[in-house]
């Protein structure tokens, strides 16, 4: 079968190898089936963690709170300043696992790209590069329409960017 992924590809990326060695190698991991480390599902969680930590780092730098807690508004500022270039992804040890992306006040969607993987009977293999959707304006319209409906139903005033 095939699988389109929009967030993380499976594999033994440098950060995955470091976690295996330093966490699981030291007996501190809690995953019962360690063969799942580096799987598409495990790497989805790792990709999310990388993004949240990058947002936190940004927030701490922006608000002169390095090493200290930030509040929700400060974290949002840091999240909206995420710029995961190919160079930054490589520096973090996840180059190739995620498509490069940037977040802003007006765009929390990320890369907006996907890759197709195919199952070979034992594992998924990437069979395309990171591809853009055929009609990003249509998708953006769906996102904005859904967000406006949610805001109205929940009496939320959307933030102006």
Where are these regions (language model features)?
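Short, surface-exposed secondary-structure junctions/capping segments
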Residues: 140-161
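Segments of small-molecule ligand-sensing domains
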Residues: 33-42, 53-128, 133, 156-160
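Extracellular/periplasmic periplasmic-binding protein-like sensory domains
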Residues: 1-49, 131-135, 145-146, 157-158
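A short, hydrophobic/aromatic-rich structural module that often spans a beta strand
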Residues: 105-111, 136-147
